[in-house]
Swiss-Prot record:
Belongs to the MurCDEF family. MurE subfamily. Disulfide bonds: none annotated. This is UDP-N-acetylmuramoyl-L-alanyl-D-glutamate--L-lysine ligase. Pathway: Cell wall biogenesis; peptidoglycan biosynthesis. The keyword ATP-binding applies. The gene is murE. The lineage of its organism: Bacteria, Bacillati, Bacillota, Bacilli, Lactobacillales.
Length: 481
């Protein structure tokens, strides 16, 4: 429960309070209300709910619906003049985060918080950390792919970083479940829209940066994207940073006065020898490590997670066992066809991750290589040119372009846009299952491979704003082995 007095105190301390308006009267102090629930969904309110009127598309009609359901007061950046009191604020998203934090009893103070950011590798690194910490502790995890609040039950995540009301409710449930640590992926969007406003992480990890999520509804420029990624460093007590990432020198200067550790070839913590399923490291993680996920970049992600978990109480033995046990649904999943050709299913969904995926497969498969690829609609439009550039640099690839969450766009138009950046013919088959079936039918022997990129373990396609059932790349590939 939270009272109106507590609510106003939070807003005033954050310099985010304007006034309470009630029947055209302005109030600096206000009393007589307490709230047992928080909501930003007008369909889920009653007389004891504090309702947040948020979003660029919010309509007064939503508020009218809430009032008919018993709503007595709301918080907003706008007075909708509907006859009930309104708490007016300058920034609704910041208000949501701080009020949710207090309402749920400050659960962040009862958990060790580890956050990963980066253009790619966040989910894999989060899974490595989860398995490392699980050896001696009780970690919860919020990842792009799956969420677990008790370490036993996993459910599909809706956002990389949940809305603040949901985030702190879930954190409180983690505390109730006896969890000791929470591992999170923190997106640039989470900082852009203040989902984690006021939250300080025990360790923040910056894996890498490359142009992505740049478009009309995301970040307008790379500078804006990079800036919002860097906010994790400002909001972490200690940081772990990749020494060979782009703009590393800037980050090194930024974190010079806080606890930090670097990893990678230009640091004291680096991989000295690397095999397909093992590696040796020196520095704080000195030793031998077995790993199931192929690719040097996955070994680097394991190093990043290991250094973070070492700071959070994990032993070297915990880290070794955790790395050896880690598998990630939809990340470098490998199948073998009856003719011994390989099928690789991976979530690679931007130019950088596609380049790394192709390079790993080409190390092991030297025959015919088929690539199945698409790009999402209405987001990350810059990826399309990036995909074309990467494909152009791998002339031995045979490419079939297909649907990948087309949303409100025509998947064939998206494919044509990707194709416009490739200086050789490619095939377009918008039906993703048909594209996979054809690619697999063209592979004949052990040196051949099909690479299915983009959707990973997702069992849906986003079409016209809705999640439409889709069997999943791995399930479809298994069907045609």
């Amino acid at each position: 429960m939270i009272t109106i007095e507590q609510l106003l105190d939070i807003l005033k301390k954050d310099h985010n309070f304007r006034e309470v308006l009630d029947a055209d009267e302005y109030h600096y102090h206000y009393q007589g209300f307490s709230f047992e629930r928080l909501s930003y969904d007008s369909r889920q309110v009653d007389g004891k709910t504090l309702f947040f009127a948020k979003g660029a598309t919010f309509k007064a009609d939503y508020l009218k619906e809430a009032i008919t359901n018993g709503l007595q007061l709301y918080i907003s950046e706008v007075d909708y003049e509907l006859g009930i009191p309104v708490v007016l604020v300058t920034d609704i998203k910041k208000a949501m985060s701080l009020i949710a934090m207090a309402f749920y009893g400050n659960p962040q103070e009862k958990l060790k918080l580890l956050a990963f950011t980066g253009t790619k590798g966040k989910t894999t690194a989060a899974y490595f950390a989860y398995h490392m910490l699980k050896e001696s502790y009780k970690p919860a995890m919020f990842s792009t792919m799956n969420t677990t609040l008790d370490g036993k039950t996993f459910f599909k995540s809706q956002l990389t970083t949940p809305e603040s009301l949901d985030l702190f409710a879930m954190m409180a449930e983690c505390v109730t479940n006896g969890m000791t640590h929470l591992i999170m992926e923190v997106s640039s969007q989470a900082y852009l829209v203040d989902r984690v406003y006021g939250l300080t992480f025990d360790v923040g990890v910056f894996l890498n940066i490359s142009p992505d999520h740049i478009g009309p509804i995301e970040h307008p420029t790379f500078e804006d994207y990079f800036y919002h990624k860097r906010l994790l460093m400002e909001n972490s007590r200690a940081v772990v940073i990749n020494s060979v990432m782009d703009h590393f020198s800037f980050l090194a200067d930024q974190v010079a006065d806080q606890e930090h550790v670097f990893y990678g070839p230009l640091s004291d913590n680096q991989i000295t020898t690397s095999q397909a399923f093992s590696f040796e490291a020196k520095g704080q993680l000195a030793g031998h490590y077995d790993i199931q996920l192929i690719g040097h970049f996955n070994q680097e992600n394991a190093m990043a997670a290991g250094l973070a978990c070492l700071r959070l109480g994990a032993s070297l033995a915990d880290i070794q066992k955790g790395i050896a046990k880690t598998r990630v649904p939809g990340r470098m999943e490998v199948l073998t066809m009856t003719n011994h050709a390989k099928v690789f299913v991976d979530y690679a969904h931007n130019g950088d991750s596609l380049e790394k995926l192709l390079s790993v497969v080409e190390e092991h498969q030297t025959g015919k290589l088929m690539l199945i690829l698409g790009a999402p609609g209405n987001k990350g439009e810059s990826r399309r040119a990036d995909f074309g550039r990467v494909i152009h640099q791998h002339p031995n690839l045979t490419v079939i372009l297909t649907a990948d969450d087309p949303n409100f766009e025509d998947p064939e138009d998206i494919s044509k846009e990707i194709a416009s950046h490739i200086a050789r013919p490619v095939e377009i088959i918008s039906d993703r299952e048909q594209a996979i079936q054809k690619a697999m039918s063209l592979c004949q022997g052990a040196k051949d491979a099909v690479i299915i990129a983009g959707k990973g373990a997702d069992a849906y396609q986003i079409v016209k704003g809705q999640q439409v059932a889709y069997a999943g790349d791995l399930a479809i590939a298994k069907h045609y082995l």
